[in-house]
């Protein structure tokens, strides 16, 4: 089932230039910018320029060029932030149970300190 994309979500508005961002990288298929509420010393969001709700939507509908472009941008952002060594974490929440807050696919790049366990047991 196709997911409904909200063209007025905050990331769509950033892509259209309606809301400013602290840009890190822009490519043909991706935009990366600093998170406004960082959870680590380095916390950068990487988003596709296309209208995709989440990773499920993106993996089903994106072109090969968009997929490669997004993931290459994630790597370029991590390297540019000096995070390739000693390491970094990437995370993308998909859907309500994962607590996805913005209905536009976004990949978090966290770095700059030891990050600890991925999730808490519950």
Curated annotation (Swiss-Prot):
Output the Gene Ontology terms for molecular function: catalytic activity
**Lineage top rank: taxon:** Bacteria
Which parts of the sequence form the motif Histidine triad motif? 104-108
Indicate the segments forming the HIT domain, all copies: 10-120
Q: What name does this protein carry?
A: Uncharacterized 13.2 kDa HIT-like protein in hisE 3'region
Q: Which organism is it from?
A: Azospirillum brasilense
């Amino acid at each position: 089932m196709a997911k409904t994309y909200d063209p007025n979500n905050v990331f769509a508005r950033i892509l259209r230039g309606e809301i400013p961002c602290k840009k890190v990288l822009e490519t043909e298929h991706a935009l990366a910018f600093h998170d406004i509420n960082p959870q680590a010393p380095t916390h950068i969001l990487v988003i596709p320029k296309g209208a995709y709700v989440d990773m499920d939507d993106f993996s089903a509908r994106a072109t090969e060029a968009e997929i490669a472009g997004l993931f290459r941008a994630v790597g370029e952002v991590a390297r540019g932030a000096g995070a390739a060594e000693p390491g970094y974490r990437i995370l993308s929440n998909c859907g309500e149970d994962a607590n996805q807050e913005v209905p536009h696919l976004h990949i978090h790049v966290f770095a700059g300190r030891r990050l600890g366990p991925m999730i808490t047991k519950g």
